[in-house]
């Protein structure tokens, strides 16, 4: 419903769980002003590499992040690279800036976490550049209310394949 109500030039998405630092929107907005026909995503893996360095064997993995979500993100990165020839390091980020008119023009068919992937696929198919900016990230545990589950990873894979070839 938020997309329908949006009136500005851009839609800014922010997760409400405070895993992210709102100050990270400033570099995202700065990046947005550099060129047209783009969307900006905050990248948690790039932020972790920026803040902690390239830690072998799990680069881009937060010390408090489970191995499963990190591995699934590597699979998603690989799938975007294979299907779209684009390196998207964090399609599930909850820090995104979209062009309002373009997002309103899409017929969104999903709900839930898979909408992130549907919109990313549609942006790439429309020729919109997705620029990623490193952001800070403090992951929550299941006990603290983390919502994403292993099934969501499988749904994400299907969603990316589906929207690469359909709609």
Language-model region placement:
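Non-catalytic, C-terminal membrane-associated alpha-helical segments of glycosyltransferases
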Residues: 146, 150-158
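A short, conserved beta-strand element in the Rossmann-like catalytic core
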Residues: 17-21
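Catalytic donor-sugar/metal-binding loop of nucleotide-sugar-dependent glycosyltransferases
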Residues: 86-87, 108-111, 120-138
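DNA-recognition element of transcription regulators
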Residues: 117
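Generic recognition of well-ordered alpha-helical segments
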Residues: 31, 78, 122, 156-160
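Terminal low-complexity segments of carbohydrate-biosynthetic enzymes
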Residues: 23, 155-167
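Acceptor/aglycone-binding surface of glycosyltransferases and processive sugar-polymer synthases
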Residues: 1-5, 10, 22-113, 140-148
């Amino acid at each position: 419903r938020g997309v329908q109500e949006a009136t500005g030039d851009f839609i800014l998405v922010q997760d409400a769980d405070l895993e992210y630092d709102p100050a990270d929107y400033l570099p995202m907005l700065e990046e947005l002003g550099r060129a047209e026909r783009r969307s900006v995503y905050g990248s948690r893996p790039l932020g972790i590499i920026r803040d902690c360095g390239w830690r072998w064997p799990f680069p881009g993995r937060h010390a408090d992040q489970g191995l499963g979500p990190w591995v699934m993100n590597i699979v998603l990165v690989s799938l975007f690279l294979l299907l779209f020839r684009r390196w998207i390091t964090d399609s599930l980020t909850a820090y995104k800036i979209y062009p309002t008119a373009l997002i309103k023009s899409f017929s969104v068919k999903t709900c839930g976490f898979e909408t992130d992937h549907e919109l990313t696929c549609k942006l790439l198919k429309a020729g919109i550049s997705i620029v990623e900016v490193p952001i800070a990230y403090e992951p929550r545990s299941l006990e603290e209310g983390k919502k994403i589950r292993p099934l969501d990873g499988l749904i994400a894979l299907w969603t990316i394949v589906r929207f690469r070839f359909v709609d």
